[in-house]
Structure formats: C-alpha cells, structure tokens
C-alpha cells in the first residue's frame, strides 16, 4: 500500500486477506515511525496519525464484517 492514508471506500472493497495485509503493513510502518521519532526528528510527523487511523479503519471494517455474518 503506497498511500499511508487509504480511503474508507477503497478499504471496503478489499478482501479479508488484503485488509489483514494492509493492517500489518500499517502497524509495521507505525512501529518504525515511532522508533524513528524517539531517535531523531521525523520529516512528516503526521504519518504516525495517518497510520493509526488506517489501522483503526481496517479493524472497524473487519468488525463490521464479523457482525454481519449470521451466527452459526
């Protein structure tokens, strides 16, 4: 995922596997940014917030999909 802030409509069109990959990639990027922010100055501090929001969006969509499935 090249764009760190993915639109909600784009995320909703993704499969479950793609959502998992997107969340994992955003979490790894967030980890690197946090580590970098402690050791040196970030060029774009807003990237931390964008990655956190992307992770939250993915988790929200995953929860919506789980709740939409019929209980078996």
From Swiss-Prot:
It comes from the Bacteria. GO terms for molecular function: structural constituent of ribosome. Disulfide bonds: none annotated. One of its GO terms (cellular component) is cytosolic large ribosomal subunit. NCBIfam families: L29. Belongs to the universal ribosomal protein uL29 family. This is Large ribosomal subunit protein uL29.
């Amino acid at each position: 995922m090249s764009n760190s802030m993915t639109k909600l409509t784009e995320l909703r069109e993704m499969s479950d596997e793609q959502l998992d990959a997107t969340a994992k990639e955003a979490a790894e990027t967030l980890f690197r940014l946090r580590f970098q922010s402690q050791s040196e100055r970030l060029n774009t501090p807003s990237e931390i917030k964008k990655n956190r929001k992307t992770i939250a969006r993915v988790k929200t969509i995953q929860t919506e999909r789980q709740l939409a499935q019929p209980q078996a």
